[in-house]
């Protein structure tokens, strides 16, 4: 469940079992922004359900902080505009081409493209790794972006 931080800011704490990230929710007068997409379709579904249970509107926009799997692998699950920085999107375009079989994952650890911890958590979050879907964000920015959610 999301914890109320202020009248307009809510935080869902991380879940270390499968490395689900802290997720922020900002409620503007007109729009709501979810900060971090979750690490899977299942994580995104849980976030959606928790927002509904708490009477919070579904996000109009989803933004991610960086490309790491726990922050970005749920991006495809949101049917709203998504936002990421240029370097993050470049990396997501690269990662979406990765294979997720054991050998490919082990090879990325050897080449230091990834780490054992992430592989273990990905395998735990995705019993069926064919379900991994990596996408870049719809909106890409360089340096800064201003989003008016309505006061």
Regions found by a protein language model. Give the residues of each.
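Active-site metal-binding motif and surrounding structural segment of the metallo-beta-lactamase
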Residues: 42-87
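Conserved beta-strand hairpin/beta-sheet module of binuclear metal-dependent hydrolase folds
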Residues: 2-52
């Amino acid at each position: 469940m999301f914890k109320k931080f202020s009248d307009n800011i809510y935080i869902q704490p991380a879940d270390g079992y499968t490395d689900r990230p802290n997720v922020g929710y900002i409620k503007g007068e007109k729009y709501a922004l979810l900060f971090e997409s979750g690490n899977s379709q299942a994580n995104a579904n849980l976030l959606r359900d928790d927002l509904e249970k708490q009477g919070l509107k579904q996000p109009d926009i989803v933004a991610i902080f960086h490309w790491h799997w726990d922050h970005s692998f749920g991006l495809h699950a949101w049917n709203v505009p998504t936002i990421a920085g240029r370097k993050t999107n470049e990396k997501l375009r690269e990662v979406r081409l990765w294979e997720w079989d054991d050998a490919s994952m082990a090879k990325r650890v050897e080449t230091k493209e990834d780490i054992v911890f992430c592989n273990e958590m990905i395998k735990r979050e995705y019993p069926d790794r064919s379900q991994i879907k990596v996408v870049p964000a719809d909106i890409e920015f360089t340096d800064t972006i201003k989003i008016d959610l309505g006061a």
